[in-house]
């Protein structure tokens, strides 16, 4: 959520050094083409705002703090600012933020210690199904708890530098470690709850950042989280990022999808 607040502040402040986006990968590398076929670029009109994850042909999962009045998505992209034959564009017919997410946090404000970013996820219903190809494939929800110490991969088009807002064209990937939540509790002022995951590199330098919100956290090959919030500047030592823990929400996700075919 801090990523979105900073993104909005930069946009409203007239920053023109880079196209406006939300959060981004620091310390990463260009993802191999088609290696993240579930990764979705979420737009408000023609402005990229967040990442997302394709769960099936009709549904995208993203962060609730990415909530805006209108959405459309691009699937199968590896380059944000270029046309690609593999890419598919879809409108979003309806959005479903988690009912327990505190939407008042969307008002721009300085993060406070009492802020609780729990339940930060949202489903987007596509107006027409995605075509499944080598570049566009869904990923399954988790069926068990993630293992501490797992190697996790995060991806996104968020800022590639921790302080100066700089967006990449190529989809970025970075490997980080799944850490005990106590590490994030100790090193963040905001609440870290049992519906969140703590992941990063304690030495710093590798992190999600401004523009990565809603993108996938894949640990040992399994989708376990989506990017939620983290430190500013991104990639600070001893301050891992915080992710929504999807195993806590699989029933809500499945029920919402089933009730809105």
From Swiss-Prot:
Catalytic activity field: Preferential cleavage of Arg-|-Xaa bonds in small molecule substrates. Highly selective action to release kallidin (lysyl-bradykinin) from kininogen involves hydrolysis of Met-|-Xaa or Leu-|-Xaa
Name the UniProt record assigns to this protein: Kallikrein 1-related peptidase b11
Catalytic residues in the record: 65 (charge relay system), 120 (charge relay system), 213 (charge relay system)
PANTHER family in the cross-refs: KALLIKREIN-1, KALLIKREIN-RELATED
Assigned EC number: 3.4.21.35
GO biological process: proteolysis
Glycosylation sites: 102
UniProt cross-references to InterPro entries, sorted A to Z: Peptidase_S1_PA (IPR009003), Peptidase_S1_PA_chymotrypsin (IPR043504), Peptidase_S1A (IPR001314), Trypsin_dom (IPR001254), TRYPSIN_HIS (IPR018114), TRYPSIN_SER (IPR033116)
Chain ranges of the Peptidase S1 domain: 25-258
S-S pairs: 31-173, 50-66, 152-219, 184-198, 209-234
Native source species: Mus musculus
């Amino acid at each position: 959520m801090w990523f979105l607040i900073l993104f909005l502040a930069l946009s409203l402040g007239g920053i023109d050094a880079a196209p406006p986006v939300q959060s981004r990968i620091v310390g990463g590398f260009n993802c191999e083409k088609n290696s993240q076929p579930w990764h979705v670029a979420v737009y408000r009109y023609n402005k990229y705002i967040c990442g997302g994850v394709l769960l099936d042909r009709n549904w995208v999962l993203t962060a609730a703090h990415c909530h805006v009045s209108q959405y459309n998505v691009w699937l199968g992209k590896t380059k944000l600012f270029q046309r690609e034959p593999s890419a598919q564009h879809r409108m979003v017919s309806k959005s479903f933020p988690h009912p327990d997410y505190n939407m008042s946090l969307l008002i721009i404000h300085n993060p406070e210690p009492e802020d609780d970013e729990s339940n930060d996820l949202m489903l987007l219903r596509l107006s027409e199904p995605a075509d499944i190809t080598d570049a566009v494939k869904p990923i399954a929800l988790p069926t068990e708890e993630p293992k501490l110490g797992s190697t996790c991969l995060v991806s996104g088009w968020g800022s590639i530098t921790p302080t100066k807002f700089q967006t990449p064209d190529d989809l970025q990937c970075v490997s980080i470690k799944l850490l005990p939540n106590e590490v994030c509790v100790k090193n963040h002022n905001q609440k870290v709850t049992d519906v969140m995951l703590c992941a990063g590199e304690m030495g710093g330098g590798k992190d999600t950042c401004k523009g990565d919100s809603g993108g996938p956290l894949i640990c040992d090959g399994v989708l376990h989280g989506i990017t939620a919030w983290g430190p500013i500047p991104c990639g600070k030592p001893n301050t891992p990022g915080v992710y929504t823990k999807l195993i806590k929400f699989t029933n809500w996700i499945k029920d919402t999808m089933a009730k809105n075919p």
